[in-house]
UniProtKB/Swiss-Prot annotation:
UniProt keyword annotation of Transport present: no
Lineage of source species: Bacteria, Pseudomonadati, Pseudomonadota, Gammaproteobacteria, Enterobacterales
Gene (name only): ynfA
UniProtKB keywords: Cell inner membrane, Cell membrane, Membrane, Transmembrane, Transmembrane helix
Superkingdom of source: Bacteria
PANTHER family: UPF0060 MEMBRANE PROTEIN YNFA
Membrane-spanning intervals of the chain: 6-26, 31-51, 61-81, 85-105
Protein name: UPF0060 membrane protein YnfA
Source organism (scientific name): Escherichia coli O1:K1 / APEC
Length: 108
């Protein structure tokens, strides 16, 4: 379970970076060259999703919970926004959903 969760967090980080870099280019007039590492990051994101031992839809559903948590960490660390009680509560609920889905992988 820990290996799967860490893999999900790595996957989420690749997706967020792959989306953040084009956002910087479009919204903040950053260099167009940011699209190159963004593409690499998104390709790595897709590859990491294939490493999970479950049906794709189940992987995507469970991954969503970890993505929420990772995005909130990004919000705090990169964007510098203080998390609210609602952020923490939502992250906890999303992470519990992910754990329930992953716990059932070997039982179907």
């Amino acid at each position: 379970m820990i290996k799967t969760t860490l893999l999900f967090f790595a996957t989420a980080l690749c997706e967020i970076i792959g989306c953040f870099l084009p956002w910087l280019w479009l919204k903040r007039n950053a260099s167009i060259w940011l699209l190159l590492p963004a593409g690499i990051s998104l390709a790595l994101f897709v590859w990491l999703l294939t490493l999970h031992p479950a049906a794709s839809g189940r992987v995507y559903a469970a991954y969503g919970g970890v993505y929420v948590c990772t995005a909130l960490i990004w919000l705090r660390v990169v964007d510098g926004v203080k998390l609210t009680l609602y952020d923490w509560t939502g992250a906890l609920i999303a992470l519990c959903g992910m754990l329930i889905i992953v716990a059932g992988w070997g039982r179907t």
